[in-house]
From Swiss-Prot:
Expressed in granulocytes, monocytes, most T-cells and a subset of NK, NKT and B-cells (at protein level). Expressed in the spleen, lung, liver, testis, bone marrow, lymph nodes, spinal cord, kidney, uterus and small intestine. Expressed in mast and dendritic cells. Expressed in the lung of N.brasiliensis-infected mice. Keywords: Cell membrane, Disulfide bond, Glycoprotein, Membrane, Receptor, Signal, Transmembrane, Transmembrane helix. This is Cell surface glycoprotein CD200 receptor 1. It comes from Mus musculus. Belongs to the CD200R family.
Amino acid sequence: MFCFWRTSALAVLLIWGVFVAGSSCTDKNQTTQNNSSSPLTQVNTTVSVQIGTKALLCCFSIPLTKAVLITWIIKLRGLPSCTIAYKVDTKTNETSCLGRNITWASTPDHSPELQISAVTLQHEGTYTCETVTPEGNFEKNYDLQVLVPPEVTYFPEKNRSAVCEAMAGKPAAQISWSPDGDCVTTSESHSNGTVTVRSTCHWEQNNVSDVSCIVSHLTGNQSLSIELSRGGNQSLRPYIPYIIPSIIILIIIGCICLLKISGFRKCKLPKLEATSAIEEDEMQPYASYTEKSNPLYDTVTKVEAFPVSQGEVNGTDCLTLSAIGI
């Protein structure tokens, strides 16, 4: 009779847990194990949470008035296990999980849910909530997997080829192309569990100018369009944003230099003309003085002042020269 009552009470608690569970937590890939020879009821759940988001893990939804002890057993990969426990009768809270960013979602006397405010790769592991009641123990296991969206890059290469890369994703991303080409895909695993996938494709058809790289991942899908190169000049396209500004700057500098040179010439020519005029003016007084003081200038003046005929010159050359005083 006692066993029948205990089994009936256990069934009521199970029905209550199933009815209330959907109101607070959403569990995926859930499997339930129930051994009829033991009052222990166990539920195994796999949960995938994106990195940087909040995770909320729930125990069996059993009224706290029926619970005696609620214990979270946390086993993170690469770290020793720790526990967070709450005794209902004494309302005492005990924890050995300090510094791991794992706490009660609220006060345990209100709700025994566990909260991770910002999920990181270090939070991967198993989380077990064990609820002890007079009717039996209820255990809920979570296998927490952290999702990391990949960083996607893509670029064209020579000879009508293109590269698409999904870096550091968890799990590994899937890369496909449209239209299909001759593709080679490689992957590289990292120490933190992330994977980098790189796909290189080549298209022989000349009528294919644009292709699409499709990256599929649990955190979301991406479709990227790439224009294939048509010749060697396409390899310069990534450098065009740097080449054009450099050419413009060189043109501006050249114009400034030409303006400075032309302005210097205009300023220099008037100075040269003014200098020549000053030198000529300075020479004129000296020439006047020389002309006045030199007897040779007087003689020439006299000869020019008294011209003679041709016959007189022929007959009286010596007399004339003597008379003049030469």
